[in-house]
């Protein structure tokens, strides 16, 4: 395989562009086609969290090459080498690099935690092996698929919005002002800035 090099933000943009295209596709589904909506919504939730993790990996790797953040380089590079789980990275890295922590107890941090929990329930799914009693017989080995069945069009769109909001919180810690969020999102996720107010990327 030939080696291909690209700008660090390229892969992040590709994942988020894929997610936006998926959200558009879901919106075009017939509302009665619940099966397709749930299939695409599940992929949307998974892709949103994956996109954030790739962003976190690349963004912090780029930052620790800058003079201001070189103090954290050995720490971040070692964690990258160990392939630290996303949960630990988002809790440890901002403090190590910026001297500030993300708040996971409320607001965007809590929304992202909830999204990550949903994603984990989808990708780490296992049969609950339940028994259903029916008149005259039992059905054994059934799985609780309530989480999957709860997915709808909003699930994927919300996942995209929460992912973007969470990335903006990392921008905030790095010193980027709110007025620059749309341009930073464009650079790092490929989201084209519009005339909408900055409030649209804040938590609802």
Name each model-derived stretch.
Residues 38-63:
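Short, hydrophobic, well-ordered secondary-structure elements
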Residues 1-8, 12-15, 45, 73, ...:
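Intrinsic-disorder-associated interaction segments
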Residues 22-25, 29, 62, 66, ...:
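Surface-exposed polar/charged interaction patches
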């Amino acid at each position: 395989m030939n080696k291909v090099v690209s700008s660090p933000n390229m892969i992040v943009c590709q994942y988020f562009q894929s997610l936006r295209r998926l959200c558009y596709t879901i919106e075009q589904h017939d509302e009665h086609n619940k099966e397709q909506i749930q299939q695409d919504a599940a992929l949307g939730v998974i892709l949103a969290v994956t996109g954030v993790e790739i962003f976190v990996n690349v963004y912090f790797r780029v930052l620790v090459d800058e003079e201001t953040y070189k103090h954290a380089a050995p720490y971040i590079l070692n964690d990258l080498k160990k392939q630290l789980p996303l949960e630990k990275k988002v809790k440890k890295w901002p403090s190590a690099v910026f001297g500030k922590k993300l708040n996971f107890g409320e607001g965007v941090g809590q929304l992202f935690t909830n999204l990550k929990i949903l994603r984990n329930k989808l990708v780490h799914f296992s049969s609950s092996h339940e028994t259903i009693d029916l008149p005259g017989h039992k059905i054994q080995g059934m799985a609780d698929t309530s989480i999957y069945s709860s997915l709808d069009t909003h699930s994927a769109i919300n996942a995209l919005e929460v992912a973007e909001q969470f990335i903006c919180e990392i921008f905030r810690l790095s010193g980027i002002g709110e007025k620059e969020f749309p341009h930073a999102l464009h650079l790092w996720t490929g989201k084209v800035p519009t005339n909408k107010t900055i409030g649209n990327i804040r938590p609802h």
